[in-house]
Amino acid sequence: MSEEVPVIKLEDWKPRTKVGQLIKEGKINSMKELFERNLPIVEPEIVDVLLPKLRYDIVDIGIVQKQTDAGELSRYKVLIVMGNMDGYISYGTGKAKQLRVAIQKAIRDAKMRIIPVRRGCGSWECTCGESHSLPFIVSGKAGSVEVTLLPAPKGTGLVVGSVLKTFLSLAGLKDVWSRTKGSTYTHENFIKAAYIALYNTYRFVTPVDWGRMK
């Protein structure tokens, strides 16, 4: 079950970068505008202000050990997925001695990775024209894992595994098929491959976009 991402209040935020200052002053008012101006997310508070209704879900909690002079040091490692269920998605990892701190670090990491997801109706079996699926087939690879996401007709649902279903739901996708290769049980590479696939929705320019680029 996803939970709401904690955010900082605008009046409590003291920007440390030029981009942050522009947002604080109201010169950039949306995440869409930030990406259109090709500006990076350099502070997690930027996401708090521009995307205040994010939700996250914990995908994996593990324990990692490191050998030190004082003996073995154990820490929690957390993997989360994050999105606003309306076209923005991310994932993040965090390590700490305390689980709560590891989750906070993962949330902060995910905020810095937020990307837009292009949605559409790309299945030849569906002509509704609504943004319920993907506009075309996309793929992503991380390590040995490769994920291919395919547009599905309206009403199909997310015909994917449980981990991927959570991720795609947070992106606002409703109807998708998938093909996977490699060690999908390694959740971090699995999610990263899916993240790269969704990132690729904006790397391909369709004929519809040609007029917008003039």
From Swiss-Prot:
Which parts of the sequence belong to the S5 DRBM domain?
Answer: 54-117
Q: Which GO terms describe its cellular component?
A: cytosolic small ribosomal subunit
Example of a GO biological process term: translation
Keywords (A to Z) from UniProt: Ribonucleoprotein, Ribosomal protein, RNA-binding, rRNA-binding
One Pfam family cited in the UniProt record for this chain: Ribosomal_S5
* InterPro entries from the UniProt entry: Ribosomal_Su5_D2-typ_SF, Ribosomal_uS5, Ribosomal_uS5_arc, Ribosomal_uS5_C, Ribosomal_uS5_euk/arc, Ribosomal_uS5_N, Ribosomal_uS5_N_CS, Ribsml_uS5_D2-typ_fold_subgr
**Family per similarity comment:** Belongs to the universal ribosomal protein uS5 family.
- UniProt function note: With S4 and S12 plays an important role in translational accuracy.
Q: How does it assemble?
A: Part of the 30S ribosomal subunit. Contacts protein S4.
The molecule here is called: Small ribosomal subunit protein uS5
Q: Which organism is it from?
A: Sulfolobus acidocaldarius (strain ATCC 33909 / DSM 639 / JCM 8929 / NBRC 15157 / NCIMB 11770)
